[in-house]
């Protein structure tokens, strides 16, 4: 094993490559671990060695563990400037997930009409007067809150992207 310096962006590219490599070996194992042969023919036995394939998969898994652990340590120990304060990368990721969920709710609310007619069915004999559904909030306030949350997410993403492209950390692989 050797010590390697990488950024978070590069580490994620390495992880994708390792995942592809692992899928290759898993497919090789799946296709080579068994074969079918007719009783009256010479079997065509696939080129497969369990020990070799299992070793390759284990080596890839070990590298994945090391890189993900280094990313996690990096994410919980290093801080970046976000707005007027600082947050760990881990905190930024959690906060962004929360804000994205909130943004989805605000998006739904901002798209509501202040007054909507409710269809009670054509053949309803109980009600003759139409019914309306009204929003119970300040639509302009919600629109403003949506824009604020969207801008906060964008600022966090820009800070995170800059960090992921520039900050280097050590990984033993």
What annotation goes with each model-predicted range?
Residues 1-173:
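Structural preference for solvent-exposed beta-strand-turn elements
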């Amino acid at each position: 094993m050797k010590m390697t310096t990488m950024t978070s962006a590069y580490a994620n590219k390495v992880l994708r490559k390792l995942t592809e490599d692992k899928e290759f070996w898993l497919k090789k194992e799946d296709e080579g671990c068994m074969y079918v042969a007719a009783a009256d023919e010479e079997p065509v036995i696939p080129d497969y060695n369990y020990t070799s394939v299992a070793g390759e998969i284990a080596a890839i898994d070990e590298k994945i563990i090391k890189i993900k652990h280094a990313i996690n340590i990096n994410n919980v120990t290093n801080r970046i400037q976000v707005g007027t304060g600082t947050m760990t990368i881990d905190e930024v990721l959690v906060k962004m997930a929360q804000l994205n969920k909130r943004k989805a709710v605000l998006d739904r609310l901002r798209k509501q009409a202040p007054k909507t007619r409710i269809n009670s069915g054509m053949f309803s004999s109980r009600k003759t007067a139409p019914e309306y559904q009204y929003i119970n909030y300040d639509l302009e306030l919600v629109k403003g809150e949506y824009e604020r949350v969207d801008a906060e997410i964008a600022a966090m993403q820009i800070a995170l992207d800059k960090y992921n492209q520039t900050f280097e950390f050590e990984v033993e692989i």
